[in-house]
Amino acid sequence: MTRLLVVETSPRGNYSISRNMTRGFVAEWQAAHSDGEVTTRDLMETDLQFIGAPWLQAYFTPSEQHSPEMKAELALSDELVGELLACDHLVVATLVYNYNVPAALKAWIDSIVRKGMTLGFDGKGLVTGKKATVLMASGGVYTEGSPIRDRDIATQYLRLVLGVIGIADVTVVAGGGAKAVDMRETTMEDFIETLQPAIEAAAA
């Protein structure tokens, strides 16, 4: 069975462009993988805390020495890592805030980059044999030829992090210019339609 893991980050529900991109992707993916299984991790519905001192203490303590409190501290991180390792295809659906990923996605990343689980002690990624698709909605346009292409920190960051943990096969579907929907210069449906060929190709 082929498994898809979808990580959602937008707080905007049905008004979210990245979530609408996800809907199109999942529909195409399910059509191509009739026996596939989809798991959705909605970061807006996950009590994901930023890393603090108790988490770090648990992280740097050998597992056989973990107290019940330490185990509880890492429980959600363990769950998120398990979801990632179980999937064949990872989808990260995200918006862009000030040129980079939102805080919730950064918190998810900090929870899944784990030495001995997703990253070897030699620095080599352990999440191999998988592919990833990034569905990104941004107000600005950062694709090839854009005068502000160098501001595309979000794409560079996600490619870097995914590569570090071992996922080299990364496709980015860039929904640049998404502010046109909020400014009512275009409709959500028309905007998503322009991205549909890229979404279909990524889901194949």
From Swiss-Prot:
Which enzyme class? oxidoreductase
Q: One Pfam family of this protein, by short name?
A: Flavodoxin_2
Regions that span the bilayer:
none
Which superkingdom heads the taxonomic lineage of this protein's source?
Bacteria
Q: What is its EC number?
A: 1.6.5.-, 1.7.1.17
The UniProt record gives the binding positions of FMN as S10, S16, I17, S18
Cofactor comment text: Binds 1 FMN per subunit.
Cofactor(s) required, per the database record: FMN
Keywords carried by this UniProt record: Flavoprotein, FMN, NAD, Oxidoreductase
GO MF: electron transfer activity; FMN binding; oxidoreductase activity, acting on NAD(P)H as acceptor; oxidoreductase activity, acting on NAD(P)H, quinone or similar compound as acceptor
Catalysed reactions listed for this entry: 2 a quinone + NADH + H(+) = 2 a 1,4-benzosemiquinone + NAD(+); N,N-dimethyl-1,4-phenylenediamine + anthranilate + 2 NAD(+) = 2-(4-dimethylaminophenyl)diazenylbenzoate + 2 NADH + 2 H(+)
- State the similarity comment: Belongs to the azoreductase type 1 family.
Recorded hits in PANTHER family, A to Z, give: FMN-DEPENDENT NADH-AZOREDUCTASE 1 (PTHR43741), FMN-DEPENDENT NADH:QUINONE OXIDOREDUCTASE (PTHR43741:SF2)
What's this protein's function?
Quinone reductase that provides resistance to thiol-specific stress caused by electrophilic quinones. Also exhibits azoreductase activity. Catalyzes the reductive cleavage of the azo bond in aromatic azo compounds to the corresponding amines.
Instruction: State how it assembles.
Output: Homodimer.
This protein is called what?
FMN-dependent NADH:quinone oxidoreductase
Species this chain originates from: Granulibacter bethesdensis (strain ATCC BAA-1260 / CGDNIH1)
